[in-house]
């Protein structure tokens, strides 16, 4: 809210769905622009202002591959504009989606998704380590990246594309943007903004790539507000 009072937009940038993100930031949601689904969907003032869907045939092919080549350990989520379509095996994905507050629907085949697909993800309840090399190089054309300890994402958008869309819409210079990231799916965003920060807990190659480190974004933002 203090940022907004100074004319600065705060933008949660996440792989999460809009409904989940808005609930998470409910007290200040009207002061935010929401970069959802890793840049696949952008919301402002409760309206979708930009969307970057995947080619339908490719999205379905990726979903089937993630499902069949994850050794019975992977559960697949296909993201629409504001609904998650779940191919689940009872291994924990559904409980996680319910916990974070997503709108969701259970499906049995990617062809059942009734809208444009913005992201395809696999949830690996034992962790992504054994599957990173299996999926990330294969689906590089769809920006395949590790998105946390249990998730691998594919999308034709990325956080960088999302940030560019926001800056164009709100007439903001990328050089005036500060961004915080902690994983490889943040690189496209961190590489284009004027002031990128990497979190202290990020992987070593990311900490080496970016000189600005912090344990908490709040610390940096409080200092920024003091000086501005």
List each model region and its residues:
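Active-site phosphate-binding/coordination module
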Residues: 1-92
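Short hydrophobic/aromatic-enriched beta-strand-loop microsegments
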Residues: 31-37, 52, 97-98, 144-145, ...
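Short active-site oxyanion
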Residues: 6-11, 30-32, 118-120, 175-177, ...
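Asp-based, Mg2+/Mn2+-dependent phosphohydrolase catalytic module
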Residues: 173, 192, 196-228
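Short loop/helix-cap segments at secondary-structure boundaries that form the rim of catalytic
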Residues: 25-28, 45, 132-137, 189-191, ...
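Hydrophobic residues within well-ordered alpha-helices
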Residues: 3, 38, 163, 189-190
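Conserved acidic, metal-coordinating active-site core of Asp-based
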Residues: 69-180, 186-189, 201
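Phosphate- and divalent-cation-binding pockets in alpha/beta enzyme and binding domains
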Residues: 20-23, 130-131, 162, 188-189, ...
